[in-house]
Curated annotation (Swiss-Prot):
Keywords on record: ATP-binding, Magnesium, Multifunctional enzyme, Nucleotide-binding, Nucleotidyltransferase, Transferase
Coiled-coil spans in chain: none
Cofactors required: Mg(2+)
Pfam families: GlnD_UR_UTase, GlnE
Region named Adenylyl transferase: 436-925
Catalytic activity: [glutamine synthetase]-O(4)-(5'-adenylyl)-L-tyrosine + phosphate = [glutamine synthetase]-L-tyrosine + ADP; [glutamine synthetase]-L-tyrosine + ATP = [glutamine synthetase]-O(4)-(5'-adenylyl)-L-tyrosine + diphosphate
One GO term of the biological process aspect: regulation of glutamine family amino acid metabolic process
Disulfide bonding pattern of the chain: none
Free-text function comment from the UniProt entry: Involved in the regulation of glutamine synthetase GlnA, a key enzyme in the process to assimilate ammonia. When cellular nitrogen levels are high, the C-terminal adenylyl transferase (AT) inactivates GlnA by covalent transfer of an adenylyl group from ATP to specific tyrosine residue of GlnA, thus reducing its activity. Conversely, when nitrogen levels are low, the N-terminal adenylyl removase (AR) activates GlnA by removing the adenylyl group by phosphorolysis, increasing its activity.
Organism: Burkholderia mallei (strain ATCC 23344)
Gene Ontology molecular function terms on file: [glutamate-ammonia-ligase] adenylyltransferase activity; [glutamine synthetase]-adenylyl-L-tyrosine phosphorylase activity; ATP binding; magnesium ion binding
One Gene Ontology CC term in the entry: cytosol
This protein's name: Bifunctional glutamine synthetase adenylyltransferase/adenylyl-removing enzyme
The keyword Hydrolase belongs to this UniProt entry's keyword annotation: no
């Protein structure tokens, strides 16, 4: 144990030196406390000792004295451990937070008991006991309390009511808790001969100093809804109940408070509007700091409010919480460093930035404590007195003050740069080009003036539009629409800024797509106009608007997808996420965590859709950048579908009331494009559901489960649909059971049942492209064994060829083409001819060449066929190239929004001829 005469804290802190002189036992107490970290249990035990000295029950004066003595001892202990290098920032702030919570909870318990003796216990409308909740805001809420800090508090209670009555007549619950709150403030903050415990600031409550001291949850909710401002959302991020949580009244209050605060602070959508709000708040704080510096030059160098200071780190962290906390529960934490860790883990900042901000934060908080230990003053100003400067530098281990300032400036420069990267106003500055001036004249009140049409058409022509009159008509429709007219002023300002930028960008857009790109951009703006956060994103990040225009110009389908799902705008900001490798296990784990934190089934369904849409959009961006081949696009989309099915099966099963086991013996089997890993952006999923469970309830349970699963996959929520599902390939098609027992599926496919309940040849054709997709992998392996057995069954060539040709004719008849254009998929000489030929070879020859049943795609199977001498290598390459060409054209046409993949016949004349020759050779027709 440190000897009391050697205490660093007494030699450094003038406040502690004075306190020890007035209370001789303090030095020994500090020395004893400083031997180990000060725990909450130790604080409570010491408070018990101090209160016992004042008699039982302790009076209010005895309570004040005990709390002030405890505060002096705890302050000295953390100062000693900190100055000796034995306590880090987390220990110092944690101890001070524990002290505040212990003081609040003990004071409330004693004061409430006194008031209840007079007025009776506070009760709600149904007679239930009520409790006063004390919400710690700011650094208290974040468990980051500094050593000489105010505590920001808000008092809340569950509901209005009346006390039960005691020595005096009953009073309203509101009056009871108001009296309790006033007395609590006095106990904590009143300056006595023993000092104070904590200065209390109540200005963050609804309506500030003009509002009631305590408020019911109903009043708080109404205030949030009607008057809540952006800075209050920021403040409530740190809000945390610091009163006891053990009683039923306290637990009820905590649950209801969380239900009110969470949707106010954390919006369901990505909220980029907070960037401007925080920028404005920061500027107000800076102006106040500059005003104070003018009045007190000795306080000018402020490490909290100045550039690169503590507040800028807090803002840099909390902007992620406000923007993303509604969708990512990992951001709903209070400590600043925890937020930075999650931002780094989520790929929103680099590990280098996280480390730099963390080191700066810890340095600044340590420096802050050194400044405050000196005189127990709530100061953040660097000293001007040479002796004070020297003492400060020495306490931090620097040779002199200049070395300290050099390190401080390095940290502040890093913080300032990171803050500006997020919050700097990115509005274009400088002189406006002629194009800019033209855009400004176009998107203006002139759009409401029919007499200005000719001039506006001329302006649009100057910007390079091919059909300026049509573009003008669209702009006028938007300008005159009720949607635009009804926008709040702040949203309209943002809308106008983005509209100007979109028109200014027109000359740089590919001329072939310029008109439709800008028109689609205004379609998007109309869609997001009432969601100010998206307008804020496009305003704050001009690069995002450039990418939007790029997507809208490159693909009609992608443009429509973005307009339907505007939350995807956020994906345009994150180059690192776009470029990161596809890691489906990590994707599923992250999605599971978000689902576990979601507020109910509806929110979970939305989260599934948002996660899927974000990955589809990422694939699209890579596709448009030419960084994925058509085959790789299909691979990624198919892998994504597998992942989504797997997670959805888990979450739906977990909520099934009838489930009889923890994990379902159930699997989704993929057919068609998903089975062959040739999925497109808008493809249906061809699925069948299998189960293998001996439980007598299994058929009923899995049928119910399958229905629920289909609902989760296909229902249109506010976030859209997840997938369109086609289950017609299940045994007996639409007449069959929704989910099939594995053994029944085996007998059906192997034709071991009665003739009316056995698979057709076309079902075996479909089986060539089938595979396990999601769910129970054991069932997946059993399915693959059945598939192998079916496909390797010997078959008669003539009978098989006849049935496949007949099925080909049915497919052709089912997709009539009355145009002169060639249907890449269904017309003769197209993709279906290649697929049927490959399936014929697999079914006919897999008994001798089982390698052919591998589900590797049609092009790879053509090579396998040639390897076994069933076609020449040259023919395999020619037909494979034709299939690849068809897929590329189909892919491009789908991106262009074409429902039917049809082209001019001469564009693929060589490919059609090669495929027709193949068909004639194989089937003789």
């Amino acid at each position: 144990m440190t000897d009391a005469s050697d205490l660093l804290s007494l030699s450094y802190s003038h406040y502690l030196a004075r306190a020890a002189a007035a209370r001789p036992a303090l030095a020994e107490r500090i020395a004893a406390w400083a031997a180990a970290p000060v725990t909450r249990a130790a604080l409570d035990a010491r408070l018990d000792e101090l209160l016992a000295q004042g008699g039982q029950p302790p009076s209010e004066d005895a309570l004040k004295k005990a709390l002030r003595q405890l505060r002096g001892e705890a302050f000295g202990a953390v100062a000693e451990r900190d100055l000796a290098g034995r306590a880090d920032v987390a220990e110092v702030t944690g101890t001070m937070t524990d002290l505040a919570e212990a003081a609040i909870q003990r004071a409330l318990a004693l004061l409430a008991a006194e008031l209840e003796a007079q007025y009776g216990e506070p009760r709600g409308p149904s007679g239930e006991r009520l409790a006063l909740g004390v919400v710690g805001m700011g650094k208290l809420g974040g468990r980051e309390l500094n050593v000489s800090s105010d505590i920001d508090l808000i008092f809340v209670y569950e509901d209005d009511g009346e006390t039960a009555g005691g020595a005096r007549a009953p009073i309203s619950v509101h009056e009871f808790f108001t009296r309790l709150g006033r007395r609590l403030i006095g106990v904590l903050s009143e300056a006595t001969a023993d000092g104070y415990v904590f200065r209390v600031d109540m200005r963050l409550r609804p309506n500030g100093d003009s509002g009631p001291l305590v408020c019911s949850l109903g009043m708080l909710e109404e205030y949030f809804y009607v008057q809540g401002r952006e800075w209050e959302r920021y403040a409530w991020i740190k809000g945390r109940l610091v009163t006891e949580r053990a009683s039923a009244a306290a637990r009820r209050l905590a649950q209801q408070l969380d239900a009110i605060v969470k949707p106010f602070v954390y919006r369901r959508y990505l909220d980029f509007g907070v960037i401007g709000a925080i920028r404005s708040l920061h500027e107000q704080i800076r102006q106040e700091a500059r005003r104070r510096a003018t009045m007190r030059p000795d306080k000018a160098d402020d490490i909290k409010l100045g550039r690169g200071g503590i507040r800028e780190i807090e803002f840099s962290a909390q902007v992620f919480q406000l923007i993303r906390g509604g969708q990512d529960a990992g951001f709903r934490v209070q400590p600043t460093l925890a937020v930075l860790r999650h931002a780094s883990a989520s790929g929103l900042i680099t590990e280098e930035v996280r480390a730099g901000l963390t080191h700066a934060y810890l340095f600044l908080r340590t420096l802050e404590h050194r400044l405050q230990y000196r005189n127990d003053a709530q100061t953040h100003a660097m000293p001007v007195d040479p002796a004070e400067r020297a003492a400060l530098a020495a306490s931090l281990g620097f040779a002199d003050y200049a070395a300290l300032i050099d390190r401080l400036d390095q940290h502040r420069a890093f913080v300032e740069a990171q803050f500006d990267q997020v919050f700097a106003d990115k509005a274009d500055g400088g002189a406006r080009r002629e194009d800019d001036q033209a855009a400004g004249c176009i998107w203006s009140g002139a759009l409401a003036d029919d007499g200005a049409d000719e001039a506006l058409v001329a302006r649009l022509a100057e910007l390079g539009f091919a059909d300026p009159a049509a573009v003008l008509a669209r702009l006028q429709a938007v300008w005159r629409s009720s949607r635009y007219a009804g926008l709040p002023e702040s949203s309209r300002v943002r809308f106008d800024r983005v509209a100007h930028r979109a028109l200014e960008a027109a000359p740089g857009i590919d001329a072939a797509h310029r008109d439709e790109t800008v028109v689609r951009c205004f379609d998007l703006l109309e869609t997001v106009g009432r969601r100010g956060a998206y307008l804020a994103l496009l305003t704050e990040y001009p690069a995002a608007l450039r990418r939007v225009l790029s997507v809208l110009g490159a693909t009609r389908w992608g443009g429509g997808y973005l307009i339907r799902h505007p939350q995807l705008l956020d994906e345009l900001l994150d180059d690192e996420a776009i470029d990161s490798p596809f890691d489906w296990p990590a994707f599923k784990d992250a999605l599971r965590r978000r689902l576990a934190a979601a507020d109910g089934a509806e929110h979970q369904m939305d989260l599934l859709r948002h996660a899927h849409q974000a990955e589809v959009f990422r694939i699209l961006l890579l596709d448009l950048a030419g960084r994925l081949s058509v085959e790789h696009v299909s691979d990624r989309l198919s892998e994504l579908a597998d992942a989504m099915l797997d997670v959805t099966i888990e979450v739906v099963w977990s909520q099934l009331a009838k489930r009889h086991r923890d994990t379902p013996c159930f699997a989704a089997i993929a057919y068609g494009k998903l089975g062959g890993k040739e999925l497109g952006y808008a493809s249906d999923l061809d699925l069948i559901f299998l189960y293998d469970d001996p439980d007598e309830r299994a058929a009923d349970v899995y049928t119910t489960f399958a229905r629920r699963l289909i609902t989760w996959l296909t229902t249109a929520t506010g976030a859209g649909t997840l997938f369109d599902i086609d289950l017609r390939l299940r045994p007996n098609g639409e007449a069959g059971l929704l989910v099939t027992d594995l053994d029944a599926f085996r007998r059906y496919q192997l034709r071991e049942g009665d003739a009316a309940n056995t698979a057709w040849v076309w079902e075996h054709q479909a089986l060539t492209r089938a595979r396990y997709s999601a769910g129970d992998a054991r069932i997946g392996a059993a399915f693959e064994a059945i598939r192998v057995q079916v496909l390797t069954t010997p078959r008669d060539a003539a009978v098989l060829a006849k049935e496949i040709v007949e099925m080909r004719e049915k497919v052709l008849a089912g997709h009539p083409n009355t145009t002169e254009r060639f249907d890449l998929k269904h017309d003769r000489g197209g993709m279906v001819d290649i697929e049927f030929a490959v399936q014929y070879w697999v079914l006919l020859h897999a008994a001798r060449h089982p390698e052919m049943i591998r589900n590797t795609g049609n092009i790879a199977l053509l090579r396998e066929v040639s390897r076994f001498g069933l076609m020449s290598e040259e023919e395999a390459e020619t037909v494979g190239a034709a299939y690849r060409t068809y897929r590329k054209l189909q892919h491009r046409l789908r991106l262009d929004g074409m429902e039917k993949a049809r082209v001019e016949p001469e564009r693929v004349a060589a490919e059609r001829q090669a495929v027709a020759a193949l068909w004639a050779r194989v089937f003789g027709a």
